[in-house]
């Protein structure tokens, strides 16, 4: 009989894509950029490249976080501070806790039958904010966030 369940946070319990889109739109607007579809698509291409570089060990997490906004702002010809843009985005994302349909109820039900553990490869401060605002900590015995562990998931280490 199973006693433990490991669950992933993003796109299993919380809708990361919705949270990302809303946080990015708020951030871009704050910095005077219209969050048009082509701008969001450009960000996603830049963001994907940066995360791939992290997975290959070519960039650090901090370089990804700031570098993606530096590249986006450069591509758009916007003279704004990429560090401030990153902070704004992470602040906006940290409160983005949009449950996938039925996920909140499923986690509550599973927590009555199993010891639950959570894994996430997100940024620690952002994920902690999302978990707190969604009131999810109460369901999990332990939360594993890759940044806190020093490994990206899935890592063999």
Describe the function of each predicted region.
Residues 25-29, 70, 74, 108-111, ...:
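Class I S-adenosyl-L-methionine
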Residues 1-3, 114-115:
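Short coil/turn segments at beta-strand junctions that form active-site/ligand-binding loops
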Residues 79, 137-141:
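Conserved H-loop
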Residues 2-9, 13-101:
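N-terminal helical cap/lid subdomain that shapes the substrate entry/recognition surface
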Residues 84-87, 92-96, 103-134, 142-152:
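Substrate-recognition element of Asp-dependent hydrolases with the DxDx(T/V) motif
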Residues 154-157:
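Short loop-to-alpha-helix "cap/lid" segments that border enzyme active sites
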């Amino acid at each position: 009989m199973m006693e433990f369940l490991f669950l992933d946070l993003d796109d299993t319990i919380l809708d990361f894509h919705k949270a990302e889109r809303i946080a990015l739109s708020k951030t871009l607007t704050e910095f005077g950029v219209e969050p048009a579809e082509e701008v969001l698509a450009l960000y996603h291409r830049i963001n994907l490249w940066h995360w791939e570089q992290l997975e290959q060990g070519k960039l650090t997490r901090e370089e990804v976080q700031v570098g993606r906004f530096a590249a986006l702002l450069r591509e758009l010809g916007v003279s704004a501070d990429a560090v401030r843009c990153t902070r704004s985005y992470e602040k906006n994302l940290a409160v983005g806790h949009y449950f996938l349909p039925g996920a909140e109820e499923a986690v509550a039900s599973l927590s009555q039958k199993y010891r639950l553990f959570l894994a996430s490869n997100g940024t620690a401060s952002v994920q902690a904010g999302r978990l707190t605002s969604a009131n999810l900590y109460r369901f999990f015995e332990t939360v594993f966030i890759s940044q806190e562990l020093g490994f990206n998931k899935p890592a063999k280490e």
